[in-house]
Amino acid sequence: MQSMQEREIIEGALRGEERASRLLFERYGPMLMAVCQRYCRTQAEAEDVLQDAFIRLFEKLPKYGFQGSFAGWARRLTVNVALKTYQRKRYQMEQSGIDNLPERGGSPTAYADLGEKELLELVQNLPDGYRIVFNLYAIEGYSHKEIGEMLGIQEASSRSQLLKARKTLQQQIQHRQRIAI
């Protein structure tokens, strides 16, 4: 349920009030940016997805209807924008013949105790398929069946990619811990 202030801000944005729209961005921008960062490889890409998500949010705002949590609604919309961006990017790469480029590497600094920032970096470095499935399952709480439907893959593929993502993350964490010792 929305607080009265939240409802007033949303209603103001629905009326096209610039101040209300800015307040929505300021209030939900950081939370939605965190969602974008989990689905994107770079900060610049996450910022682009966030911008697209807010454009979509303001377009779809009349359909919100004040049913349920606005934060949850905005989060789901942002996840959908991030997935569509990923699928569009993957399609463009396949069409241009560069779909097998090596994944971004790098030598991140290792820490014995991983903080949120370090864990986010590890997740961002996962191959695209692993990263998307990991986020949808482990963070967003979707089932493998739902993930399969969203991404157009088999349920078994979703399970396999999640297992591989977890294994990769465990290996990266162990590697960082060995370096830190």
Predicted feature locations:
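Sigma70-family region 2
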Residues: 14-15, 38-41, 52-69, 88-90
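Conserved RNAP core-binding helix
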Residues: 9, 25, 33, 43-60
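N-terminal module of bacterial RNA polymerase sigma factors
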Residues: 1-31, 38, 124, 145-146, ...
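Residue-level preference for hydrophobic side chains embedded in well-ordered alpha helices
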Residues: 24, 28, 32, 53, ...
